Amino acid sequence: MTDQSGNGVRSGSASEAPPSAKADFVVVANRLPIDQVNLPDGSTEWKRSPGGLVTALEPLLRRRHGAWIGWPGVPEDADDPDASTEPIEQDGMTLVPVRLSAADVAKYYEGFSNATLWPLYHDVIVKPTYHREWWERYVEVNRRFAEAAARTAAEGATVWVQDYQLQLVPKMLRMLRPDLTIGFFLHIPFPPVELFLQMPWRTEIIEGLLGADLVGFHLPGGAQNFLILARRLLGAVTSRGNVGVRSRFGEVQFGFRKVKVGAFPISIDSAELDQHARTRATRQRAKEIRAELGNPRKVLLGVDRLDYTKGIDVRLRAFSELLEEGRIDPEDTVLVQLATPSRERVQSYIEMREDIERQVGHVNGEFGKVGHPVLHYLHRPIPREDLVAFFVAADVMLVTPLRDGMNLVAKEYVACRHDLGGALVLSEFTGAAAELRQAYLTNPHHLEGVKDAIEAALNQSPEEGRRRMRALRRQVLAHDVDRWARSFLDALASREPINEESH
């Protein structure tokens, strides 16, 4: 489970790895699983950054003598003599820092990755910005990651590249180290063909991904879009037929190479969350949360990173209108919205936060009482223990993104409900909706539909609630994050031909 507090476990066990060490399994991601913390006295500490990806890949890294390549999270001057790129040993893993300057962060990360690719890949909810200077820095930083992977990987090693910030790395790494087996997984949605074609550097992105032996997406639709683009932009020969989930892979014949394309829905460490939710301390904290809220009859909950894709404004409008129409009683129902700060220097995010906080004030001004707000809003990191307790305390979980690659919060809520209580209202435009069919599915672009789904979830019978939650838990507990990682790596290791006609 992602720790929304950012309060990782401090570790003093980091030490430089032997310079000759080579890894048989390498993960390449924008961030390391630990963050560098520069202390006032000039010394450095490392803070662990828990998350779903770390949970999935740490055991694999240890078993396979693996290395993780990524940015430590602190911008540094490239000429800084203290900005070492030497590998670090941390809890049995080799971590290889890639240093980024403040200009790199501004242009490669905040610019091209998050103001160009992020909105484009999320259905252009906010208009993407195209700057050649950002693109050039994206190319440069991707090359830096590829070179680090080439130096780190042993002969014939497996390299797994992660996410939209590093889409050029597979091709660059292939050119540097043709002996490697390379996989790539995209953790956000892959856009429809017509939207992707807006990208000025569309061909370079597709070519970059085709440097991999296996390109993975959350959903078959993303894989199908990629196959169409490879055919249209590069004239590649691609397989016919539909891509399945963890099966029926697509194939691209590109030059002298064949590239597999597949769908692998990511998940969570559901068994660990289930166990955590059962503890006496968690159950007690959940009771305390409800008491702090005034012991309402019903508690609605939203947990999101503060992002325009998450549909926070949609659920606030729906909640407000349900109150106005008398379909929810403000005396016995509260909504808690936990919003983790995100990209606070980006103007569109600043404006979005201001708009959401205006909505919160309006709802409480209209329907709250002194000492009894009907909408509780927290804009700060939330400790992991409190998050689990909030999941246990909530009667209805609201997950209403306009577009989301998967949305692990929905799965986290389900994993915490061993009591078979609660209800999940889930946007149809999340990857999770394809798996969590017993949720109250809704179209976040249709406000009346969102309101109806919330009302139905609030008023479900205990029998209906248990039936739905039992089915949801069966899915989430069976398909955990370890199974996701193993299914991808098994497909990457397999060299079996794909028996489908091509065109």
Swiss-Prot record:
UniProt feature, compositional bias: Polar residues: 1-14
Which InterPro entries does the record associate with it? Glyco_trans_20
Q: Output one GO MF annotation.
A: alpha,alpha-trehalose-phosphate synthase (UDP-forming) activity
UniProt-annotated stretches for the region Disordered: 1-20
This entry carries the following GO cellular component terms, namely: cytosol
- What this protein is called in its record is Trehalose-6-phosphate synthase
Assigned protein family: Belongs to the glycosyltransferase 20 family.
Keyword DNA repair in the entry? The reply is no
Catalytic reaction equation(s): ADP-alpha-D-glucose + D-glucose 6-phosphate = alpha,alpha-trehalose 6-phosphate + ADP + H(+); CDP-alpha-D-glucose + D-glucose 6-phosphate = alpha,alpha-trehalose 6-phosphate + CDP + H(+); GDP-alpha-D-glucose + D-glucose 6-phosphate = alpha,alpha-trehalose 6-phosphate + GDP + H(+); TDP-alpha-D-glucose + D-glucose 6-phosphate = 5-methyl-UDP + alpha,alpha-trehalose 6-phosphate + H(+)
Q: Cross-referenced Pfam families, in alphabetical order?
A: Glyco_transf_20
**Biological pathway:** Glycan biosynthesis; trehalose biosynthesis
The site feature described as Involved in alpha anomer selectivity is recorded at 118, 188
Q: How does it assemble?
A: Homotetramer.
Residues engaged in binding UDP-alpha-D-glucose: 51-52, 305, 310, 408-412
UniProt keyword list: Glycosyltransferase, Transferase
The UniProt record gives the binding positions of D-glucose 6-phosphate as 31, 109, 163, 343
Q: Which EC number(s) are documented for this chain? A: 2.4.1.15, 2.4.1.347
Instruction: Please cite one Gene Ontology biological process associated with this protein.
Output: trehalose biosynthetic process
